[in-house]
Swiss-Prot record:
It comes from Xenopus laevis. CDD domains: RecA-like_CDC48_r1-like, RecA-like_CDC48_r2-like. The keyword Signal does not apply. It catalyses: ATP + H2O = ADP + phosphate + H(+). This is Transitional endoplasmic reticulum ATPase. It is an enzyme of class 3 (hydrolase). The gene is vcp. One of its GO terms (biological process) is autophagosome maturation. Phosphorylated.
């Protein structure tokens, strides 16, 4: 939802979803009375609605379902509730807590004859006359109102049998009086057919797109139910809706739900099915679909995958596609004014559709069904888990917060994955060969939070399937030293994701990018991995050289695609490793395929500026040649924080060694502090190499000892009865001493000097070292700002040219 300033407009856009409060709208409550034909209200509510005990009322539920019941008064029932038992609730397709409307229905006729059939799985093994045992006692002297399509449950003779009302005369509802003829001949109804109609999708089954649903409701339900509204105001009702959005967000589902809830005739056209090899046949298929819909008005025509049948005409080479597009255009223009036919279409590539279709009068409203935010994800998870057995520790809110960038389909997959994991845990109790599974095992199944955590580790959003990165299991503990850098990074990525309200309060947009630079082997890439793991954001790693291809224009398209994916899966961290390979200073590189590298940089620059503020996309670049990077990319607003990652000092070296050795057995007398003191000028990678070499030496010694012992045992079998201890239980001092003999520094002093000078140039030419506001409000009293800093930067800039000479 939008922020506080525009709540007014927001309320209007979703006004259609609000329940109007009227006295005849009541909340469904559990009934004490088991009778299938009774509902109970409080006496006060009955007086208000002018009902008397024993009156027949018509109840309206969801998905256009109705039921007729007899009303009773119940003093324990509160005024705004209505009590009904499970059978009535199922017929109305409502749950406890839903809202239904109630109307008096005085003129219900006595039925001449009714036809009821049992449902097959409830009558298995019953011998004897169904009518005598079940139906006769149920209807005798009861004057029950029934409606066509109702299912009712009758208990008798130790069993409960469900019946369905197939036909009533007069239709659709009547009262079963003593002289009504009851037929119960015919095949029992299959349970599956019933279940299908029970499981139809309704608006309740759609989560995460409340606003879009409101738009669609006002576009579809108003013209279908109250066309007079538009007539009165003198405009044509809209008749085309285009739903677009990434795959898996529920476009087809919304169309199905709209059809079920409005009760309109639903005609589904799958894009490719229309095509036919005969000339003119494809167009006539389309015409038939529209004719069929007009006959059965009010109707909804839903075209799935519209881009398959209506691509841009100038781009397609096939004659058939062009004719189909033209046919669709004329059909949509030719729909009669109030034929009550609405055309909905879904696609995930709205830009490849012929533009003539996207004007007013054809598909005049385009609804973007985007990737849901965390509240939307919570709604979707609740919908998918409403029939699941969850244990008490499952915290769906936390799951919703951790699934950034997931669409509805991904969340459905997540739930089923978690459920499968719960079944796997009980797998040792289940035998595939058995006919049935113990009820005990069945009852003990429940999905726990651990199952969800496991499923989370397995799932990634479908928008990122191609560029998926295994989020590395690197934590902050793995990184020795660099405390300030870690803090800056956490502020950059975690604050905007976790505390967006603070940024709103201070009226600032968070910064977008960071550039790490420094000598090789100091943990630039490692830092990016750690931040991807620590803050729950999606992570796309881009290796510079992979973007460049030999085709003209392809490299820029790659860049565009990556940024699009990142925006879809926001919050997302884009990590450009070896940034200098793709963002070289422009103009110097003549002869690389028509300046492909320059165009790639231009594309990256425009993408970075075009990152919309709404989406949390962060860019981290890493390079060890900051001097050759294009200066335009280093300005604030693109990569605005330049972080120099220096060679580790003694404290950091100590932390790096400890981080490297925290899983290794090290002898007590190995003095890591001394090791850190002696390795001045070594980078993190060099220190890791020392540790690895020491481990290698210990492993070598251990294996040699085992071979020697094996040899001794073979030569002298009797002596070696006693089992000895492990000859090399830990890494000793001599291993480290030996490893230090081979240790080498990968960064020379000369290189370090260059980096530090570059760092200083950046700091000093851009910052004021001694800037202070004048005290006491006297302007101009302090030193002129930047006098210290500016001149300090001066003597570096002269040497700038021969820095890398």
């Amino acid at each position: 939802m939008a922020s506080g300033s525009d709540t007014k407009s927001d309320d209007l856009s979703t006004a259609i979803l609000k329940q109007k409060s009227r006295p005849n709208r009541l909340i469904v409550d559990e009934s004490i009375n088991e009778d299938n034909s009774m509902v109970s209200l409080s006496q006060a509510k009955m007086d208000e609605l002018q009902l008397f005990r024993g009156d027949t009322v018509l109840l309206k539920g969801k998905k256009r379902r109705e039921a007729v019941c007899i009303v009773l008064s119940d003093d324990t029932c509160s005024d705004e509730k209505i009590r009904m038992n499970r059978v009535v609730r199922n017929n109305l397709r409502v749950r406890l807590g839903d809202v239904i409307s109630i109307q008096p229905c005085p003129d219900v006729k006595y039925g001449k004859r009714v036809h009821v059939l049992p449902i097959d799985d409830t009558v298995e093994g019953i011998t004897g006359n169904l009518f005598e045992v079940y139906l006769k006692p149920y209807f005798l002297e009861a004057y029950r109102p029934i409606r066509k399509g109702d299912i009712f449950l009758v208990r008798g003779g130790m069993r409960a049998v469900e019946f369905k009302v197939v036909e009533t005369d007069p239709s659709p509802y009547c009262i079963v009086a003593p002289d009504t003829v009851i037929h119960c001949e015919g095949e029992p109804i299959k349970r599956e057919d019933e279940e299908e109609s029970l499981n139809e999708v309704g608006y309740d089954d759609i989560g995460g797109c409340r606003k879009q649903l409101a738009q669609i409701k006002e576009m579809v339900e108003l013209p279908l139910r109250h066309p007079a509204l538009f007539k009165a105001i003198g405009v044509k009702p809209p008749r085309g809706i285009l739903l677009y959005g990434p795959p898996g967000t529920g476009k087809t589902l919304i169309a199905r739900a709209v059809a079920n809830e409005t009760g309109a005739f639903f005609f589904l056209i799958n894009g490719p099915e229309i095509m036919s090899k005969l000339a003119g046949e494809s167009e006539s298929n389309l015409r038939k679909a529209f004719e069929e819909a007009e006959k059965n008005a009010p109707a909804i025509i839903f075209i799935d995958e519209l881009d398959a049948i209506a691509p841009k005409r100038e781009k397609t080479h096939g004659e058939v596609e062009r004719r189909i597009v033209s046919q669709l255009l004329t059909l949509m223009d030719g729909l009669k004014q109030r034929a009550h036919v609405i055309v909905m279409a879904a696609t995930n590539r709205p830009n490849s559709i012929d533009p003539a279709l996207r004007r007013f009068g054809r598909f005049d409203r385009e609804v973007d069904i985007g990737i849901p935010d965390s509240t939307g994800r919570l709604e979707i998870l609740q919908i998918h888990t409403k029939n699941m057995k969850l244990s008490d520790d499952v915290d769906l809110e936390q799951v919703a917060n951790e699934t950034h960038g997931h669409v509805g389909a991904d969340l459905a997959a997540l739930c089923s994955e978690a459920a499968l994991q719960a079944i796997r845990k009980k797998m040792d109790l289940i035998d595939l060969e058995d006919e049935t599974i113990d009820a005990e095992v069945m009852n003990s199944l429940a999905v726990t939070m651990d199952d969800f955590r496991w499923a989370l580790s397995q799932s990634n959003p479908s928008a990122l399937r191609e560029t998926v990165v295994e989020v590395p299991q690197v934590t902050w503990e793995d990184i020795g030293g660099l405390e300030d850098v870690k803090r800056e990074l956490q502020e950059l990525v975690q604050y905007p994701v976790e505390h967006p309200d603070k940024f709103l309060k201070f009226g600032m947009t968070p910064s977008k990018g960071v550039l790490f630079y420094g000598p090789p082997g100091c943990g630039k890439t490692l830092l990016a991995k750690a931040i991807a793991n620590e803050c729950q954001a999606n992570f796309i790693s881009i290796k510079g050289p992979e973007l460049l291809t030999m085709w003209f224009g392809e490299s820029e398209a790659n860049v565009r695609e990556i940024f699009d994916k990142a925006r879809q899966a926001a919050p997302c961290v884009l990590f450009f490793d070896e940034l200098d390979s793709i963002a070289k200073a422009r103009g110097g590189n003549i002869g690389d395929g028509g300046g492909a590298a320059d165009r790639v940089i231009n594309q990256i620059l425009t993408e970075m500026d075009g990152m919309s503020i709404k989406k949390n996309v962060f860019i981290i670049g890493a390079t060890n040649r900051p001097d050759i990077i294009d200066p335009a990319i280093l300005r604030p607003g693109r990569l605005d924080q330049l972080i120099y990652i220096p060679l580790p000092d003694e404290k950091s070296r100590m932390a790096i060694l400890k981080a490297n050795l925290r899983k290794s057995p090290v002898a007590k007398d190995v003095d890591v502090d001394f090791l850190a003191k002696m390795t001045n000028g070594f980078s993190g990678a060099d220190l890791t190499e020392i540790c690895q070499r020491a481990c290698k030496l210990a492993i070598r010694e251990s294996i040699e000892n085992e071979i020697r012992r094996e040899r001794d045992r073979q030569t002298n079998p009797s002596a070696m009865e006693v089992e000895e201890d492990d000859p090399v239980p830990e890494i000793r001092r001599d291993h480290f001493e030996e490893a230090m003999r081979f240790a080498r520094r990968s960064v020379s002093d000369n290189d370090i000097r260059k980096y530090e000078m570059f760092a200083q140039t950046l700091q000093q030419s851009r910052g004021f070292g001694s800037f202070r506001f004048p005290a006491g409000g006297q302007s101009g009293a302090g030193p002129s700002p930047g006098a210290g800093g500016g001149s300090g930067g001066g003597h570096f800039t002269e040497e700038d040219d021969d820095l890398y000479g």
